[in-house]
Swiss-Prot record:
InterPro entries: Nict_dMeBzImd_PRibTrfase (IPR003200), Nict_dMeBzImd_PRibTrfase_arc (IPR002805), Nict_dMeBzImd_PRibTrfase_sf (IPR036087)
UniProt lineage: Archaea, Thermoproteota, Thermoprotei, Sulfolobales, Sulfolobaceae
Family affiliation: Belongs to the UPF0284 family.
GO MF assignments: nicotinate-nucleotide-dimethylbenzimidazole phosphoribosyltransferase activity
HAMAP family per UniProt: UPF0284
Protein name (record): UPF0284 protein Msed_0735
Leader sequence segment: none
Amino acid sequence: MIVDHIGNLSDALKGKKSTFALVIGTTDVSLIPGITVAGATPELTMFTPAADAEYLITGSCKVIKGVPVTPDGIPTPALLSRASLSLINVNKLVVNAGARVTPKIPFVDLHGEPGRDIRKGGVRKEVAENIIANATVLGENLSEEVLVVGESIPAGTTTAAAVLTGLGFNGVEIVSSSSPNNPKELKRKVVEEAVRSAPRDTTERIYWLADPVILAVAGLAMGFRGLTILAGGTQMAAVSAVIKELSPEKLNSVGIITTKWIINDTTARLMELVKTLGVKLSHANLDLSQSQHEGLRVYERGFVKEGVGAGGAMALAMANGVTSENLVKKIDAFYSDLINAQR
């Protein structure tokens, strides 16, 4: 079931032709120990986006063995996205905004570059402008009625917090985490240092505090002529804030769809921010507590929560008649395949 909070995105998805785009990139912020669990070690976070893309499209990873996992061994949310999209007829596309490791599958390259540590400037101005311009052109040339955009970038909630803070919001208090223990004090320290050194000009400030994925997703939404679904949590709220600064008229055709685990996250304040921005918000209401696998049941305890467009992918499946029961069965089956492949 899709639950609408602001607007009526559940109806807007029904019977529409859709493209699912996964935007990947990296930021050197993910190398800060303790800032993210989107990889077994800080160094392996550089492989996570490429591996997520490979698994989403092909069902296996080439840049690493197995699939991306947290330090606790919990698998990537790409599992949820791939299972959901396998049940419906939808075009899939991988977009490289600036990943240090690129996937060994076909992808669209925006000619960006990996994000730097935001304390020293996240994305160079000329690179940022190039990413946004190329993403906008790509968006303009996608012809379906609905564009669902997911993301994979470890430490993306920290760069999102920085962008939101730079735009006048209490960013660290707003954003979620892939861990049940949101490392807010570490995020706050990094964000405050980055904001102190950021330029005063609003656009240049965004570039300084952002990562390549935030900029690319904003560009895609600004170029696309139909309804853009930002499939993610608080990172997509930061994208919405960027769109509001750069192309405010586009917000009318933008909505966020996330997971219930983001909506229920008591360490974040997504709903409050989205209301302020004036963006539509819904979530895919899936319960994994009855899954066959402990690695999936832990989602109900606040692990991982969202990523690789999981909420939007599940919502697409639900809008096309897939029941929650069948979706859980498919996710379980894909998880079993992963386990068997590693034996």
